[in-house]
Amino acid sequence: MASTTGEDGEVAATSRYPLCNADEREGQRLSLLQKLGDPITVRWFERLGVGPGWRCVELGAGGGSIAEWLSDCVGPTGRVTAVDRDTSLLEPLAASRANVEVVKGDLCELELPESRFDLVHSRSVLMHVPCSDRVLEQAVRCLAPGGRVFFEETDGAPGQELSDAPEPYRAVFGPILARWTWARSIADTLRRLGLADVEDDVRQDPLEGGTDKSEFWKFTLGSVAELQEKALSSEERAAELRSQGLDPGELLRELPAMLALLDDPGFSVPFTARHRVTGRRPA
């Protein structure tokens, strides 16, 4: 049976990331994220040559679908370490797979063993944590010679550059997209850290109503709205959000109209750019 490392293990558990995997809405959101993203992620793994015997670490493993695929791919001679601050959805995987270790902890306090892994992967996680560059440093440090990193993160520039956006879109998504800038720096950081063959594949990703992606965003906005409502009950927290360019009241006022647009098959706007960044540690 595989192991689960908890608060007393190599990573301390805290809650910097605001959405809880155990929450019913978040579970549905993660399922949609897996449906949308897993086929693309798997194609990239195949392109990188992931196979039997590889030692892999998944940072922010979420619902565990990618860790499960990696477990099947690397086989009994390989190893998969799945890291998340909330491991409730990962524990069944750890209990049933001899080649899977689940680590419960905070990525900002992550200490991975040096020169250990053949693959480090993360998807739609590092853009949300305050220590993203530190995690990149840890990822490079833990690569074995010849090992690969693969990061999938989102840039909000396309949606920010939309001049004629509907008001609900501007009010709800404008402040969110404005904060998503980190992804464009990943490739340069990896080069600075000494990786070779660094590639940044960037693809535009529109937002269209009546799709799985819009359904994903309905769940996401529901969780965000709950956080905003809590902020309104705390003047200190509300002031902090306003200092970041976020207006909880405006978001909540415009949210019903935005949710209606997400249900409308005729709604389509430029939204994000997806960065898929790979790099290799020289042998």
What are these regions (language model features)?
Residues 118-133:
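A short SAM/SAH-binding and catalytic strip from SAM-dependent methyltransferases
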Residues 57, 62-110, 134:
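Class I SAM-dependent methyltransferase SAM/SAH-binding core
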Residues 19, 23-26, 201-270:
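C-terminal helical/coil "lid" or tail adjacent to the Rossmann-like core of SAM-dependent
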Residues 14-38:
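Class I SAM-dependent methyltransferase Rossmann-like catalytic core
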Residues 35-52, 69:
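Conserved alpha-helix/loop element of class I SAM-dependent methyltransferases that forms part
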Residues 109-120:
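A short acidic, Gly/Pro-enriched loop at the edge of an enzyme's catalytic core
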Residues 133-148:
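A short glycine-rich, Lys/Arg-flanked "PGG" loop and its adjoining helix->strand segment in the class I
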Residues 150-234:
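Conserved catalytic/acceptor-binding region of the Class I
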